[in-house]
Amino acid sequence: MMADEEEEAKQVLQKLQELVDQLYCFRDSYFETHSVEDAGQKQQDVQEEMEKTLRQMEEVLGSVQVEAQALMLKGKALNVTPDYSPEAEVLLSKAVKLEPELVEAWNQLGEVYWKKGDVAAAHTCFSGALTHCKNKVSLQNLSMVLRQLQTDSGDEHSRHVMDSVRQAKLAVQMDVLDGRSWYILGNAYLSLYFNTGQNPKISQQALSAYAQAEKVDRKASSNPDLHLNRATLHKYEESYGEALEGFSQAATLDPAWPEPQQREQQLLEFLSRLTNLLASKGKTKPKKLQSMLGNLRPAHLGPCGDGRYQSATGQKVTLQLKPLSTLQPGVNSGTVVLGKVVFSLTTEEKVPFTFGLVDSDGPCYAVMVYNVVQSWGVLIGDSVAIPEPNLRHHQIQHKGKDYSFSSVRVETPLLLVVNGKPQNSSSQASATVASRPQCE
């Protein structure tokens, strides 16, 4: 190539790069130039901006021969929307064949495969890009892909989740001011939380990473997935006000995405049904309730009543039977409560299994049991003992509605004694987390 041709090609590439950068800036900074009310228009606006950019790129290219880099930039422009683009796949595949060291082409091609649903091919692209050059985009995307790879065993999936956290941490280390890296680290911790027995320390790390994403990058606050994923964690931790706020914000930012609105509505319906059932003690007639409570026996405490109960520290302790009304917020060590089931409530998500518990002292308390298999449950009239109950008082306000109730959180059905009997180990399952894979 002659010197002046080289210079022309260089200028053309520079102009193409500027056009693509402007396109991505339009998409990523959309809510800095538009109000949240325009959220429903965003995808259409981005699509139109992409078409305009592609026309401008064709004009700039003319008859100039600038192979791999130009193919990559055109493929990247086509890849700006959340949808899979076959044309982008063709252009980017050509680009990496012509110039295998072109890391950005590998990253873009990986994203195309990701949108196509070919997770294994996406993994190959991001891993391959890292062999050419360590870069934060490949690390971010590899973290994301590792959590979605098909595995033959739970152990293998756990290894992938741990590796996902490692890759996200490396991405953060490369640029602590990149909000996307912090957001993906939050998602990696979210998966780790559900994959390793819901350690509160890990949920705190997830929430901290999401907060850091918003702190270092204003655009992160406009990411509906961040709000939905964080709300999922808040809901599981029974921070219902924050969960509702997050679902609502995600729905506002992406009105075309039905899930946030559905999740907000489901949670509101759950809280409404629950508070109504608690207030009416499961609509149990006073005479029936009196008869049920009259059947409570010390024998119903099972291993919680004879000094054989083993606490979380592994020591055998004698538990003191106390009325539900005397419980303090938090874990009530050395205490056991015993009551009758007056209703049960399941949601579409099946987690938690919720039932109402009453003792002779009066008020009805919600008991929320986590990590249960679908076939497990308790029946109205069952006697249930809960050792060292973890109490929480809820005061929730959302969109003009108020919900107020008390609940006992039970991390596994294995802690419960039902009709004097400990629960079988087959009653326990582990929670999983679902997310929208194409939108990290």
Swiss-Prot record:
Modified residues (Phosphoserine): 203, 221
Any GO MF annotation of the entry: chromatin binding
Physiological role: Cofactor involved in the regulation of various cellular mechanisms such as actin regulation, autophagy, chromatin regulation and DNA repair. In physiological conditions, interacts with cofactor JMY in the cytoplasm which prevents JMY's actin nucleation activity and ability to activate the Arp2/3 complex. Acts as a negative regulator of nutrient stress-induced autophagy by inhibiting JMY's interaction with MAP1LC3B, thereby preventing autophagosome formation. Involves in tubulin autoregulation by promoting its degradation in response to excess soluble tubulin.
Chain positions of motif Nuclear export signal: 13-24
TPR repeat placement: 7-61, 68-98, 103-130, 136-174, 179-216, 224-253
Organism expressing this protein natively: Rattus norvegicus (Rat)
Residues the UniProt record annotates as site (Mediates interaction with N-terminal MREI motif of beta-tubulin nascent chain): 147, 225, 259
Keywords annotated in UniProt: Cytoplasm, Cytoplasmic vesicle, DNA damage, DNA repair, Mitochondrion, Nucleus, Phosphoprotein, Repeat, TPR repeat
Gene3D superfamilies tied to this protein: 2.40.50.550, Tetratricopeptide repeat domain
Highest taxon listed in the record's lineage: Eukaryota
UniProt main location, coarse: nucleus
Protein name: Tetratricopeptide repeat protein 5
A cellular-component GO term for this protein: cytoplasm
Region (Mediates interaction with 28S rRNA of ribosome-coding tubulin): 285-287
Domain notes: The tetratricopep-repeat (TPR) motifs may function as protein interaction domains.
Post-translational modification: Phosphorylation by ATM kinase induces nuclear accumulation while interfering with nuclear export, and phosphorylation by CHEK2 kinase enhances nuclear stability.
Localization per Swiss-Prot or TrEMBL: Nucleus; Cytoplasm; Cytoplasmic vesicle; Mitochondrion matrix
Name of the gene this protein is made from: Ttc5
A biological process term (GO) from this entry: DNA damage response
InterPro entries: TPR-like_helical_dom_sf, TPR_rpt, TTC5_OB, TTC5_OB_sf, Ycf3/AcsC/BcsC/TPR_MFPF
Subunit-level organization: Interacts with JMY and p300/EP300; the interaction occurs in the nucleus and augments the association between JMY and p300/EP300 in response to DNA damage. Interacts with PRMT5; the interaction is DNA damage-dependent and promotes PRMT5 interaction with p53/TP53 and subsequent methylation. Forms a complex with HSF1 and p300/EP300; these interactions augment chromatin-bound HSF1 and p300/EP300 histone acetyltransferase activity, resulting in enhanced heat-shock-responsive transcription.
